[in-house]
């Protein structure tokens, strides 16, 4: 979706690629970048080995992080919260943090499948006590057959083609 108030929305191109063309462009970009030594480590991030953006990995792994200031988001001890964006209220100590839940099993699954390393099912079970159902495993098998995922029995990872349709895959797994 193109947001109407964004620069792109205010000055849209005359022609946009079709969804199929956009997918082809994405797959070409993945191949081109990997050919030049940039490894895709997350749905929209590439880096040379050892130069991955570590700061984002804490979010994808549902780790603890502390944000300070107006509009800052934090996750501590599995509980997420944020401060309202009102700077005046924050400075006057009138901005109470707003709780918005924690990083539960669904969040973890969604965030781990953003990463090319994928979801370690043993870690998922250890952390949340959840295992994939027979129906979910059958769906995973179909994703592998279709070239959307790899699954070695312990780790489920989406391929570049799978990352394109990640939302549809997640809808089936959740």
Enumerate the language-model features and the residues they cover.
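A short, conserved structural fragment
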Residues: 144-154
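C-terminal scaffold of the Radical SAM
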Residues: 1-130
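Short, amphipathic alpha-helical interaction segments positioned at domain boundaries
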Residues: 161-174
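Minor-groove-contacting beta-hairpin "wing" of winged helix-turn-helix DNA-binding domains
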Residues: 155-159
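Short amphipathic alpha-helical interaction segments
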Residues: 129-144
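Residue-level detector of family-conserved "landmark" positions at structurally sensitive sites
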Residues: 43, 135, 153-154
């Amino acid at each position: 979706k193109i947001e109407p108030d964004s620069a792109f929305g205010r000055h849209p191109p005359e022609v946009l690629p079709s969804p199929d063309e956009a997918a082809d462009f994405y797959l070409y970009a993945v191949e081109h970048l990997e050919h030049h030594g940039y490894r895709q480590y997350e749905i929209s991030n590439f880096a040379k080995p050892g130069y991955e953006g570590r700061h984002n990995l804490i979010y994808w792994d549902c780790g603890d992080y502390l944000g300070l200031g107006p509009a800052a988001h934090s996750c501590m001890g599995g509980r997420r919260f944020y401060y309202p964006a009102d700077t005046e209220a924050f400075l006057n100590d009138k901005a109470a943090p707003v709780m918005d839940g924690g990083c539960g099993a669904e969040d973890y699954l969604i965030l781990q499948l953003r990463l090319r390393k994928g979801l370690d099912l043993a870690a998922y079970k250890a952390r949340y006590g959840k295992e994939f159902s027979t129906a979910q495993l059958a769906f995973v098998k179909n994703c592998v057959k279709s070239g959307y995922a790899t699954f070695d029995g312990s780790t489920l990872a989406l391929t570049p083609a799978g990352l394109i349709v990640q939302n549809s895959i997640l809808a089936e797994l959740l």
